Amino acid sequence: MSKNIDDIKNEDGKKVKIIKLKKKVVKIVTYNDLSVKNDSNSFVDLHNNSNKAEYSQSRDNRTGGYSQNRDNRAGGYSQNRDNRAGGYSQNRDNRTGGYSQNRDNRTGGYSQNRDNRTGGYSQNRDNRGGYSQGRDNRTGGYSQSRDNRTGGYSQNRDNRTGGYSQNRDNRTGGYSQNRDNRTGGYSQNRDSLSFQYQGSVKKTYVAKNNSQNKYTTTSMSFRRLIKTKVPAIVSSTPAADSENSKELNRKLGEKKKQQQESQKSYKRKKAETESKTIEQKVFEQLQKKKRENLANPIPKSIDIMGSITVSDLARKMNLKSSDLIAKLMALGVMVTINEKIDSDTATILVEEYGSKVNVVSIYDETVIEEEVEDQSKRVEKPPVITIMGHVDHGKTKLLSVLQNIDINQTESGGITQHIGAYTIVYNDREITFLDTPGHEAFTMMRSRGAQVTDIVVLVVSAIDGVMPQTIEAINHAKEANVPIIVAINKIDLPDSNPDKIKHQLSEYGLVSEDWGGDTIFVMISALKNIGISELLDMILLQSDMMLLKANPSKRAIGKVLDAKIDLGRGIVCSVIIEDGTLYVGDSFVGGACYGKVKALISEKGVSVKSVGPAKAISVLGFSSMPQAGDPFQVTKTEKEAKLISSKRQDLKKYESSKNVKKVTMLNLYDSIKEGALKELKIILKADVQGSVEALKNSLEKLTNDEVRVRVVHSSAGVITETDISFASASDAIVIGFHVRPTAKAQVLADQEKVEIRKYNVIYDAINDVRSVLEGMLEPDVEQQFIGFAEVRAVINVPKIGVIAGCYVSRGLIKRDAITNVMRDGLQIHSGKISSLKRFKDDVKEVAEQYECGIMIDNYANIKEGDIIEAFEVKKVKKSFKT
């Protein structure tokens, strides 16, 4: 590092070395005292890059000299500091100096006496004497031995083998006084602080001892100060130091050997990679792909909705979109990556990979995470019973008897048109009953009733027996895997035949217990109150066998039975709670709608704060109108409810958009034919969502090849001005079921000539619409034979045409009649009579056995002997058939 050592000398008990480091000069002062503090304030930067380094080591933008001037003070040989008058005595701290370097009010001398100690040339400190600079009760000598160790010229320290190199801390030494694995210099750094000249010198620091007011310069290789504590007492032997040196050399050799091996391995792999053939690279890529496939296998089954894009299907199957597109091309289907394929195509495609497809609904795609349930909190719950059966078989009358009220008084036409929920108490136990409509239009209502119930009570008339809606109710119950109790009603009538009913039901798998089956049959008469108690006992017995339980402490889960708009209260939904407890203030999701419970109204019209499992309740607080049958579930927060609702609405829009047909060459003819259909456009309004759904489905079934019903809009609530405006724009009629128009809507309807039809009974609405459709049908055209005439003469009149002189041999001939010209028993022409005359007079008809002149429109090739048959066209009104 250093070019040469310019000077080595002693100045006042300290060794001074001047070393040239390339273009810089460093003055190194070594003290015998090791009490320099190990803090950053003990070091002063002697080098400043902004100033040129001179022999004077000037710093801090000050003019330098040999005096090592600092802090913008005038320098001199006296090393003046801190605004004090200097001299050779190195005066400090406002004290009068002399050659003796007197400090701290102590009598000085050449001996540099400090701390009230008697001095001498030997620089004796801490009651220790001798030229050897002895310290800490240690025997001194020229070797400057320390820490009870035998000294020598090598200045051995801390269990280290000495030599001229002044080796320390088990490190191989040299003239540089190496310490702490750092490259040293001649500076003899002590006081538990290690400095070195390693690399280029960045800064030079001066160690400042506050107790002696002396300085020493040293150099650092880094911009931060590195402090290393040296153990105070460490035993050392030359043999141990030698072993440590060998161990260090061995480790360095091993490390170098490892580096060489690593370089050789890298070069070898690089050479192997460059020498690989194309076949080897392809093989490795295939192996890599195989490993990736093993890491991401194709699932055994995937869930999709009605349709899915190729990219989404590829993601679900852990495949590349290009692979699926290629497979579809092989199957004869041309698609792009973002094109949708239907569930059938997706099923065929997925089966090619040995997997299967499950078609799910939007609710399966947006499952709300349920809370962890404590099974110990599940308790017995009341049974939910759905009463089902054919219309007029006595379902509602039975429920009236159970509640001791006449429910049919509140239903138009004496039939149930809404799904009702009621709770009764029998033998101190609660039972919840659901009454479903029996009319064929309310199929979906009956289906929902079967899905939310625990037991189905099938009411069958002992007179009528099994009817279409009876069979439908059986199928709904079996599909929902719900047990059935058969109640044979009207046994009080003389024509009742229960055995016939048992035989009919056995054909559908319902075999009575007394016939060896497992279905409970109860004979009742709702009108005479016969067998009601026995029926209730059987219901409770069946529920006990089923071990019905629920957890009232969890968040509520249920189903929307029906929904309506109530003036003054907004949207009111009838909800059956299947599990958990619903409280006022709960946030929830109902289908694609969200909300927060504002109020809970029981079936008796009483406001309650909460409702438990197996109870029906009216809920206020929906943000929009849900669909009947939608799932109902309470969420943790309102934010979660809004998020799920938004996602479900997007999925519903997506499902609706996929139903839009694309016009292709394959379905173009069907589209043209469909455009020729006559449509009856209807805007449908009803009191509850369930009635809207039932009536809409019934009306849309009224379709044939010529006419059809198109419900352009349907919703629950009163008829508003918006409905009238929509009807006027779309040329539709408005049907209100159990609702009336507002006053303003009625005025607007009169102005716009919009027809409003109001109904209270569902089959009245259906029959009226059927009659309207019949009036829209084109009548059938029938040709009725009225007579024929023989051509006896042919008269050609210029500018008029050919006139056939005829004799009416049978029936009569009428003007404008349709004729068939027959010659030799073959029809040669069919046309209309344009002129009929008797002599010169135009007549409307000519009777039998009279002569007349007949001119046929646009026909002149008539000959004598031809027979003219006359037909009258009649239009016959068609009857509507679906």
UniProtKB/Swiss-Prot annotation:
Ranges where the record places region G1: 389-396
Region (G3): 435-438
Location relative to the cell: Cytoplasm
Binding site for GTP: 389-396, 435-439, 489-492
tr-type G domain location: 380-553
Region (Disordered): 38-192, 236-274
Gene3D superfamilies the UniProt entry points to: P-loop containing nucleotide triphosphate hydrolases (3.40.50.300), Translation factors (2.40.30.10), Translation initiation factor IF- 2, domain 3 (3.40.50.10050)
Domain of life: Bacteria
Composition skew (Basic and acidic residues), residue ranges: 243-259
NCBIfam families reported for this sequence: IF-2, small_GTP
Protein family (similarity comment): Belongs to the TRAFAC class translation factor GTPase superfamily. Classic translation factor GTPase family. IF-2 subfamily.
Protein name: Translation initiation factor IF-2
